[in-house]
């Protein structure tokens, strides 16, 4: 019975938050370092290079996201410097700034480049990798019966990798390759779910760093019907 009420309470809270966003249009909110963050004002700017910039403002803060002007999912902290998220805070004349620029560090996400061949016996196996600027990255492979790798899960993040590094899964014919998408201290994802009547709706989450390597987390971000200005 207690479990039932806990699930029911969670569901009611979720519905309440969703309704709060939809009844306060436009809306942009999330959790900054596990504390609720809500913009007083939100707007979208359409840029000449085919991207948009979404800004959410409080009295002293700005959360900014720059992504292509199209429905889709976009990784942050990659080699593409034109796609990023940032957070700035102004206090007594000082500005504290965090951004999802590419950072050297433990791997956060990989993307398959070439499935290679000869890996049939390694489906579900954890393998070492070679290449890139770092070391220690291990992957659990998903492999077709014909020996072609179709994906992998990171089991050990390693150290000192850079976005854009190409690494090779050891085994088979040693020809299955992956790209390091982003690293642990600077990463994230923006999803534009809907563009409708000059407004944008979607989700955002990211880890961003300042010049000293300090990390800021922005999670559970939702923007709803934010208009173009």
Predicted regions: what they are:
Residues 36-47, 139-143, 159, 189-195:
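Short, exposed beta-strand/loop patches in secreted or surface proteins that constitute
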Residues 55-70, 134-136, 159-162, 174-177, ...:
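Short, surface-exposed beta-strand/loop "edge" segments at domain boundaries and coil↔beta transitions
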Residues 5-7, 11-39:
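Bacterial Sec-dependent N-terminal signal peptides
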Residues 103-184, 202:
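Conserved, function-critical positions that sit in or immediately flank catalytic
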Residues 29, 53, 64, 109, ...:
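Beta-strand secondary-structure signal
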Residues 191-200, 227-229:
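A short, structured loop/turn motif at beta-sheet edges
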Residues 45-104, 184-196:
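Surface-exposed helix/loop patches within compact recognition domains
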Residues 177-187, 203-229:
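Edge beta-strand at a domain terminus
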């Amino acid at each position: 019975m207690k479990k039932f009420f806990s699930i029911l309470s969670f569901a009611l809270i979720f519905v309440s938050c969703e309704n709060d966003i939809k009844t306060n249009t436009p809306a942009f909110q999330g959790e900054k370092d596990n504390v609720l963050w809500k913009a007083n004002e939100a707007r979208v700017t359409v840029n000449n290079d085919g991207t948009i910039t979404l800004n959410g403002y409080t009295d002293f803060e700005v959360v900014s996201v720059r992504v292509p002007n199209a429905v889709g999912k976009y990784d942050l902290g990659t080699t593409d410097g034109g796609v990023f998220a940032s957070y700035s805070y102004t206090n007594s004349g000082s500005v504290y700034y965090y951004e999802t620029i590419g950072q050297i560090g433990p791997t956060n996400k990989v993307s398959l480049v070439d499935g290679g061949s000869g890996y049939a016996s390694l489906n579900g196996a954890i393998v070492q990798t070679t290449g890139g600027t770092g070391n220690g990255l291990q992957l659990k492979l998903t492999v077709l019966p014909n020996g072609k790798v179709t994906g992998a899960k990171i089991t050990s993040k390693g150290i000192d990798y850079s976005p854009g590094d190409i690494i090779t899964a050891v085994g088979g014919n040693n020809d299955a390759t992956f790209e390091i998408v982003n690293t642990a201290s600077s990463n994230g994802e923006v999803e534009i779910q809907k563009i409708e009547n000059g407004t944008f709706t979607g989700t955002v989450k990211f880890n961003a760093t300042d010049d000293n390597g300090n990390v800021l987390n922005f999670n559970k971000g939702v923007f709803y019907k934010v208009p173009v200005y």
